[in-house]
């Protein structure tokens, strides 16, 4: 890093977090031949420090637009070292090397170097961290915080439009990209994914319906009535077979039960209906986790508010997180084909197209 870049880094670090966040990861940091990487931190409202990883093109002199990541549900880090084999990591590395753009990522509490415990963090706490990071963008002298593109992956593709709270913050956003997002209630999503899961498990059609009846009771009591899964299963032990986590009745997909009760209280349809900027809404042909209809609805809601602003794209042979599969059965089994980098080009072409348009 050159002296001028080092001075800029120290200035930014002082404005965002007064004390350097210790590194927990044992692997190499991110690095790129054509981009600088800054490891910083943002302090969330509850006082926990969250790792921020920012990339910017070498020799940047003017302020640049920024791609701001709203991440997935799982407790996986956003860090994407050069040797990553993770598909979303490969996509993020592609975005980090896009000429003319910065990339801003944070690790949620307890992920990567961030303080906290991901397995005990509810969604409202996680969202507050993203909002703090969004507001910190103005502290970086190389970022044009009036030109923010929010990229939401999976769960982040659902709640992306909740990050900018005020009218002024919404005016800072130039566009959205989502991959495998959602917009229905979480209760509806759980019934959708369970129906697909049971079918892909090769249950007979009648068995799928019986299992969905049980899942409907279980998820209604948990998500809508606010009861614990252990309490429900103690009362109705016959529902135990439909609970995806087996004996762990306090977590789902590594997150606490309250995380999903928070999601159930959201109104994402209302949030996306307020969006007035361009949106690229992507869904994989072989995404069995998030349904195609959710992504179509996001595009529909944006277009109802700003006709022609949103574009829905069904990406052939793509899975939930950008993976390349040859069939839905392969996607369910996790049997990946070699990564197809065309998804990166789809995103960067769209970003460059938006930048050629006049702001506002």
Predicted features and spans:
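N-terminal cap/lid segment of alpha/beta-hydrolase-fold proteins
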Residues: 21-62
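Short, surface-exposed "cap/lid" segments of acyl-processing enzymes
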Residues: 59-95
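Conserved alpha/beta-hydrolase
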Residues: 89-113
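Alpha/beta-hydrolase active-site loop
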Residues: 120-140
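Accessory cap/linker subdomain of secreted extracellular hydrolases
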Residues: 177-273
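Short beta-strand/loop motif that positions the catalytic acidic residue
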Residues: 275, 281-283, 287
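Conserved alpha/beta-hydrolase "acid-adjacent" motif
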Residues: 288-294
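Catalytic active-site module of serine/aspartate enzymes centered on a nucleophile-bearing elbow/loop
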Residues: 318-321, 326-360
């Amino acid at each position: 890093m050159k002296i001028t870049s080092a001075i800029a880094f120290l200035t930014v670090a002082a404005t965002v977090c007064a004390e350097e966040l210790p590194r927990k990861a044992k692997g190499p940091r991110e690095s790129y031949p054509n981009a600088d990487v800054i490891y910083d931190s943002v302090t969330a409202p509850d006082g926990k420090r969250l790792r921020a990883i920012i990339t910017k093109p070498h020799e940047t002199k003017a302020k640049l637009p920024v791609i701001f990541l709203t991440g997935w549900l799982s407790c996986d880090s956003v860090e994407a070292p050069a040797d990553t084999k993770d598909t979303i990591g490969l996509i993020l590395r592609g975005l980090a090397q896009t000429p003319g753009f910065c990339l801003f990522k944070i690790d949620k509490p307890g992920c990567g170097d961030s303080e906290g415990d991901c397995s005990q963090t509810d969604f409202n706490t996680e969202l507050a961290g993203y909002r703090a990071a969004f507001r910190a963008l103005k502290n970086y002298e190389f970022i044009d915080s009036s030109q923010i593109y929010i990229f939401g992956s999976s769960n982040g593709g659902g709640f992306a439009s909740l990050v900018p709270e005020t009218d002024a913050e919404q005016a800072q956003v130039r566009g959205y990209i989502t991959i495998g997002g959602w917009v229905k209630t979480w209760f509806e999503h759980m019934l959708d994914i369970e129906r697909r899961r049971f079918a892909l498990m090769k249950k007979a059609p009648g068995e799928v319906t019986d299992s969905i009846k049980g899942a409907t009771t279980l998820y209604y009591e948990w998500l809508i009535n606010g009861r614990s899964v252990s309490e429900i299963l103690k009362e109705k032990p016959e529902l135990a077979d439909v609970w995806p986590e087996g004996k762990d009745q306090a977590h789902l997909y590594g997150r606490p039960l309250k995380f999903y009760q928070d999601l159930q209280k959201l109104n994402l349809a209302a949030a996306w209906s307020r969006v007035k900027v361009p949106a690229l809404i992507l869904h994989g042909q072989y995404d069995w986790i998030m349904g195609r209809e959710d992504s179509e609805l996001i595009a529909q809601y944006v277009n109802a508010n700003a006709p022609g602003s949103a574009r829905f794209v069904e990406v052939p042979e793509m899975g939930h997180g950008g993976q390349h599969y040859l069939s839905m059965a392969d996607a369910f089994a996790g049997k990946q084909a070699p990564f197809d980098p065309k998804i990166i080009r789809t995103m960067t072409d769209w970003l460059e197209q938006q930048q050629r348009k006049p702001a506002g």
